[in-house]
């Protein structure tokens, strides 16, 4: 009896130790551990990730008070480089990222979905060897209805001095990314990232003001029941995509989930498996999502988790953009589900 009690005590202690170790693993500590196998000149990435986390905290705080503050909800009346009406939260979140990095000495350039051209920080150049590419608010149409939103980020190393200010070195494939991830603003605020060594998630503990490790080395299931797509665009798609939707409608075991915020939908698929689709249309075959700010960062992360991301014909990470704001179709998620969508598209071609 004493031995059984002793064994139980050891088991409880081990469980407690693991929980305590996890609770003590902050984002900054975890990133430093990841960087142990990187070269010495990559250590700035720890400070860079901390700045991204700070931007996420500031945006999360603003969103949590959105219904109580003036000038947070609604549109600005302006149109961005994408031709889309700009939400007030789009502007605020974009300004937050600029402000957080402006005096950091870490990045020379910021490239955002919301800005026509990269934002240069001369005082950080050439010391700041990195470029941050980001979508400050993904799913901004959800802002006024208190639904989930996100931010997407990607880190690349600057190549050359960019003396002509054209940022041509960014027009390379997604395999040049050093790190990528997203921040999900939902019932809790989560930060999920990869540095090419697995995918790791952190939850913001409001009492500590720290992102604490939630799960390490996340693996996406090979197959999932969820398909996530805006079926309101059904009649605008190519016939091959419509055939895929008909297939999931008549096949038992599939369920549709679509929130209007890609980060939210991708996070569900990362955890539960399935596929997210944002295909091109007959009139706009290039699709809607921006390659550098949305598709490539999420493709890097999902592939690190064991999933896949494609245009339907080409791996997203192999697409070389011709311009900063280039769009691309996106099919991303569990490898078996992505392959199923590909089979319809490729047979249609």
Swiss-Prot record:
Residues engaged in binding substrate: 138-141, 230, 258, 288
Catalysis: reaction(s): beta-D-fructose 1,6-bisphosphate + H2O = beta-D-fructose 6-phosphate + phosphate
Pathways involved: Carbohydrate biosynthesis; Calvin cycle
Binding site for Mg(2+) 1: 113, 135, 137
GO biological-process terms attached to the record: fructose 1,6-bisphosphate metabolic process; fructose 6-phosphate metabolic process; fructose metabolic process; gluconeogenesis; reductive pentose-phosphate cycle; sucrose biosynthetic process
CC per GO annotation: cytosol
Cellular localisation: Cytoplasm
Cofactor note: Binds 2 magnesium ions per subunit.
InterPro entries associated with the record: FBPase_C_dom (IPR044015), FBPase_class-1 (IPR000146), FBPase_N (IPR033391), FBPtase (IPR028343), Fructose_bisphosphatase_AS (IPR020548)
Key words, A-Z: Calvin cycle, Carbohydrate metabolism, Cytoplasm, Hydrolase, Magnesium, Metal-binding
Annotated GO MF terms: fructose 1,6-bisphosphate 1-phosphatase activity; magnesium ion binding
Required cofactor names: Mg(2+)
E.C. designation(s): 3.1.3.11
UniProt-annotated binding residues for Mg(2+) 2: 135, 138, 294
HAMAP family reported in the protein's UniProt record: FBPase_class1
Subunit structure: Homotetramer.
Family label: Belongs to the FBPase class 1 family.
Protein's recorded name: Fructose-1,6-bisphosphatase class 1
Organism for this UniProt entry: Trichormus variabilis (strain ATCC 29413 / PCC 7937)
Gene: fbp
